[in-house]
Amino acid sequence: MAATDLERISNAEPEPRSLSLGGHVGFDSLPDQLVSKSVTQGFSFNILCVGETGIGKSTLMNTFFNTTFETEEASHHEECVRLRPQTYDLQESNVHLKLTIVDAVGFGDQINKDDSYRPIVDYIDTQFENYLQEELKIRRSLFDYHDTRIHVCLYFITPTGHSLKSLDLVTMKKLDSKVNIIPIIAKADTISKSELHKFKIKIMGELVSNGVQIYQFPTDDEAVAEINAVMNAHLPFAVVGSTEEVKVGNKLVRARQYPWGVVQVENENHCDFVKLREMLIRVNMEDLREQTHSRHYELYRRCKLEEMGFQDSDGDSQPFSLQETYEAKRKEFLSELQRKEEEMRQMFVNKVKETELELKEKERELHEKFEHLKRIHQEEKRKVEEKRRELEEETNAFNCRKAAMEALQSQALHATSQQPLRKDKDKKKVGGWSSIYSVTIP
């Protein structure tokens, strides 16, 4: 026998012994205690209605719970699909029910329907995430927490009588791992019984061939196994909704009045409304809640914890405690943090070096530019000095020539001023001799 088998046998817990009681103890009242506690606490049930605008989702919900929920009418011009949740407090006898109805407003109204399913998937994941965050709190209060996880998705199929639309197949395929899907044919009174029967067979065949997993009513409980097995054969349910009362015979019944006759909502020969209501509310409501928690939510929780690095065992199938997982994840985080810090430090050093090189290159370029400008300045200065010397030389030469000219002009002026004076003297001398001559000659 292998060592691992021996360890497994040695670590296995011993089988509990069965003992008989000598008298009445009282723990047989545990079911009554559980019922009393549940009734005091109340219940929550969340329904997601997916279908095209105007297909009768709100009317069917009003018919289901025999009341009128105040809802806004949706238009056919929504830019995108949006989820509209509304919560109501209902009471039947002494049982309180917090009912949330989530309507996928604008589904199927867009020209491009490729991502019509995405807001629905995101909404379901958001409710799972909110519940997971509440569970992971140190001080959590799940007793008072309003559970908004979707327990069932009623998928309304348009009664075309031919086959499912591509949008329906894609959407249900995206949702089947996240929510319990119950497909229903809306406004079933618009097609004949023979067409309806063929349509049901066609729908189930397409769902199976495309691998879409819809909710199957459980048959493992003997109390409801027989009726659930029969009802599974009626899927998808063909329903008619109406809040109007019509007099049939001596009774007022909920029905739809047509010129050719009356379609009674609660007449099983006319539609499957009663079957759907019985299966959804009276028989399998708790199973839908349990399936949501134990299957769909656990799948989401497991995937999220695995993304965070948590696991139950290592590669050798050795179990991990939460403390060990935390320590391993902490060491991994610290090593990753150190690696990131080293990368950041190295990036910073490299950036500093690159910046220094860039600054040195800029400094060299500026120095070269400065030297170039300096040489240009010196050359210009030398040229200016040469021009200044040439100008001074020309100025001196000009001044010399000017002085010489002034001297010549002065001499010429002086000579010119002396010559008239001499002429005057000569004239005076000639005039004197003439008078002498005039006196002496008789």
Swiss-Prot record:
Localization per record:
Cytoplasm; Cytoplasm, Cytoskeleton; Synapse; Cell projection, Axon
Q: Where is this region: G3 motif?
A: 103-106
Disordered: region residues: 1-21, 411-442
* Annotated region described as G4 motif, given as residue ranges: 186-189
Regions of compositional bias (Basic and acidic residues) in chain numbering? 1-16
Which residues, renumbered to this chain, carry the PTM Phosphoserine?
10
Name the keywords, alphabetized.
Answer: Acetylation, Cell projection, Coiled coil, Cytoplasm, Cytoplasmic vesicle, Cytoskeleton, GTP-binding, Membrane, Nucleotide-binding, Phosphoprotein, Synapse
Name residues in a coiled coil.
322-407
Q: Where is the composition biased (Polar residues)?
A: 411-420
Q: Where mainly found? A: cytoplasm
Instruction: Show the GO cellular component annotation of the record.
Output: axon; cell division site; microtubule cytoskeleton; myelin sheath; presynapse; septin complex; septin ring; synaptic vesicle membrane
Q: What InterPro entries has UniProt attached to this entry?
A: G_SEPTIN_dom, P-loop_NTPase, Septin
Expressing tissues:
Expressed in cerebrum, hippocampus and cerebellum (at protein level). Expressed in heart (at protein level).
Q: One biological-process term from Gene Ontology? A: protein localization
Can the keyword Cell cycle be found in this entry's annotation? Answer: no
Instruction: Give GO MF terms, alphabetically.
Output: GTP binding; GTPase activity; molecular adaptor activity; SNARE binding
Pfam families with a match to the protein in the record: Septin
Positions of transmembrane segments: none
**Function text:** Filament-forming cytoskeletal GTPase. May play a role in platelet secretion. Seems to participate in the process of SNARE complex formation in synaptic vesicles.
Q: How does it assemble?
A: Septins polymerize into heterooligomeric protein complexes that form filaments, and can associate with cellular membranes, actin filaments and microtubules. GTPase activity is required for filament formation. Interacts with SEPTIN7. Interacts with CDK14, SEPTIN4 and SEPTIN5. Interacts with VAMP2; the interaction inhibits interaction of VAMP2 with SYP. Interacts with STX1A.
Q: What is this protein called?
A: Septin-8
Organism field:
Rattus norvegicus (Rat)
